[in-house]
Amino acid sequence: MKIAKGLVGLLILYKNVCQVLCKSGSSVKSGSPWSIKNDGKSIIHDTLNSSYSDIENLNSRVSPLLFDLTEKSDYMRFYRLNLFNKECRYNLDDNVACGSSACNVLVTDEQDVPEVWSSKSLGKLEGFMPELSRQIVETDRSVMEHVDKISQSCLLERLDDEAHQYCYVDNELDSGCVYVSLLENPERFTGYSGPHSTRIWEMIYNQCLPDSSAPTIDFPALFMQGPLAPPPKPQEQLLKERMDAWTLEQRVFYRVLSGMHSSISTHLCHGYLNQRNGVWGPNLQCFQEKVLNYPERLENLYFAYALMQRAIDKLYGHLDSLTFCHDSVLQDSEVRQKIAGLVSLIHNSPKMFDETMLFAGDPSISTALKEDFREHFKTVSALMDCVGCERCRLWGKIQTNGFGTALKILFEVSNIEDEVTNFDSRSFSLRLRRSEIVALINTFDRLSRSINFVDDFKQIYSEQHKPASFKRRVLRRIKQLLFSVTPVALHPFLQKTSSILVDLYFDFKAEWDNVMLGFRYVFASYLRFPRLFKFVLFSQESPFLNWTSHHLQRYIPKNWFPEVASV
């Protein structure tokens, strides 16, 4: 009997040990914040039954093309806008400016700008502006392969009709405009927050509400602690109930704004400044508090991607009507080829958003509704001039311009494939400003990177929540035992000592890994030395023997060598 009890006890102990030491599987469980995205069948509302996995699979192919366009193209690299001299159209009593150095934007110094950029000179120019970008051309090298000098026409603006615009586009002839390199001013955490930014986001989201209805939603409560801060549940429930009563057009309008907001917050949390060590990097807690803990925000990010994908798709067949660098065949062809590759890839992918479902009712009503939609989004773009942070204002203006351009393409441009049987495609010429094209591609790139950043945060979450190793559990037990047998007064000292030892361990491990990497490299070179020695001195392809033979032949008479009879 005692033997049987002992065996049962051993079996129970063995089971417990296996559960502790052999625990495996995904650390992202069904109850985690990622559960809604883990299900590949989760459909994103107001799309053509597109799922999270559909968008991620497409983005895995699109992302490298967007990176190549935005990082290695002069055309997409520079953006000209009125960043400092445009007054806010709205009365904000708490109008403030960000005092952090992270808010600053690097631009060309005004005193270094040539005379042709002065207001007098700019006022004399029409159409293309041949001298406007000379300063950048002369002072900055091209980032494109096989190109040494930036073509001025890659930086020029072409004047266009103001009709059918969904956002306010800065006039590049304005002497207050400046060129900004987007590579030198990445979108990342600046520290800009507080009542002022909350007030601006409140005014932006209030554009979702029809003019005839009272704003029953307390948007300041939704965003009390800065961009996308955790809202109270009653307010969030009220917003959901209100959205259920909205029309499709109102829901799309809100989802675009929320998706843009989620993308911005994702970038800020991924490029977050660690105040302890001064290193920029992902901050999972920031992302959880601003986006991940609220599934509708993550869903709206993916919805905005689907909408932007459809806008890029509609460029198919219109590229011939667009000019990029008119005085440089090489740069124009490179930019055109890259954009054509992106558009072609998206065009051959499943359609994710159907713009024809919007404004599809009675023509008189739908026209008025579209005009109201357009004016509300133009108000959103105008609110970007009220942002107190320069870098936030820069990327806010770019992305509202990008989404405004996408909406313009979706709702104002004919679909060539639907009309090709009745009209020649050239009759549907698409006219876009240079700033609109640059904003459109860079905004799509922002969304694409946000999707990638979501996966990065998921990997970090999985790493933090994976089962602890046996060594870590043993060390944790030792630490608990040590704390239990020492006086409470010594606990702060022990905690600080423990943190120092952990830092020392990781620093030592990093240095040791570097030493071992160097050792393996040197040791491998020694192992390859005999083969290298044989190749250099004794092989038929030996560069040493060939060099020696070549030089010896120069001093030996040619007739000394016997002639080889031809076969």
Curated annotation (Swiss-Prot):
The active site is at C389 (nucleophile), C392. GO terms for biological process: protein folding in endoplasmic reticulum. Disulfide bonds join C88-C386, C98-C103, C154-C325, C389-C392. InterPro entries: Ero1, ERO1-like_sf. FAD binds at R188, T190, W201, S258, H261, K290. It is a peripheral membrane protein. Its main location: endoplasmic reticulum. It holds the Pfam family ERO1. N-glycosylated. Glycans are attached at N49, N546. The keyword Transferase does not apply. GO terms for molecular function: FAD binding; protein-disulfide reductase activity; thiol oxidase activity. May function both as a monomer and a homodimer. Essential oxidoreductase that oxidizes proteins in the endoplasmic reticulum to produce disulfide bonds. Acts by oxidizing directly pdi1 isomerase through a direct disulfide exchange. Does not act as a direct oxidant of folding substrate, but relies on pdi1 to transfer oxidizing equivalent. Does not oxidize all pdi related proteins, suggesting that it can discriminate between pdi1 and related proteins. Its reoxidation probably involves electron transfer to molecular oxygen via FAD. Acts independently of glutathione. This is ERO1-like protein 2.
